[in-house]
Amino acid sequence: MMELAAKEGFSTFNADNYGGHIDFRGTEEGIVGVIGHLDVVPEGDGWDFDPYGGELIDGDVCGRGSTDDKGPVIASFYAMKALKECGYTPKKTIRLILGLDEETNWHGMDYYLKHVDRLPDFGFTPDADFPAINGEMGILIFDIVRKFDPPGSKGLELSSIKGGTAANSVADLARAV
């Protein structure tokens, strides 16, 4: 994506492959951030086609990450490209910020934020739904520790619990031992 943007004449910044951005330079001070990510949760089972193939089905591009968040990122980039090709120059710089690990922990974005020269004055994310998502969930990973010793028993022990492939996806199967 960064190579394509540079080829189209946009300035780019790559934070050592932890994240980056594409700038459509404005004529005045200020940056509007358009924030997206290019990673996906694991594909899981049950696909009728290649989940990473970007299949066109009934006029829609379908596949893992097509709405969260590759589709919105690509649409944002092509909107910037179309404006540029029409001769439009924005007043504020439009910065398309590209994260690479939103689905896990955003540590790459922490790295990006430490290395970028200037943060946006405000921003939005064109994530997954039109016309807007008014709130986003977060990721909370935690351990629950509790002694399980019902009265009259010799005690039970939960030695492991496993399920799913990512902390922010719904597991199709879970197992407790």
Language-model-detected regions and their locations in the chain:
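General structural feature for long, well-ordered alpha-helical segments within catalytic domains
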Residues: 1, 14, 30, 72, ...
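Acidic/His- and Gly-rich active-site-bordering loop/insert found
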Residues: 1-64, 85-90
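General beta-strand structural signal in soluble alpha/beta enzymes
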Residues: 13-16, 63, 96-98, 124-126
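Short coil/turn connectors at secondary-structure junctions
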Residues: 28-33, 57-58, 89-94, 118-122, ...
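Alpha-helical metal-binding/catalytic segments enriched in His/Glu/Asp
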Residues: 34, 55-104, 143-148, 173-177
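Acidic, glycine-rich active-site loops and adjacent beta-strand->loop/helix elements
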Residues: 38-40, 94-105, 126-131
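Midchain, well-structured core segments that form catalytic/ion-binding scaffolds
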Residues: 103, 109-177
